[in-house]
Swiss-Prot record:
Protein's name in the database: Chitinase
Documented EC number(s): 3.2.1.14
Keyword Secreted attributed: yes
Gene Ontology MF: a single term: endochitinase activity
Keywords for this protein: Antimicrobial, Carbohydrate metabolism, Chitin degradation, Fungicide, Glycosidase, Hydrolase, Polysaccharide degradation, Secreted
Amino acid sequence: GDGTGPGPGP
């Protein structure tokens, strides 16, 4: 992920 919002992931 990009470091925004909730939840798992990169």
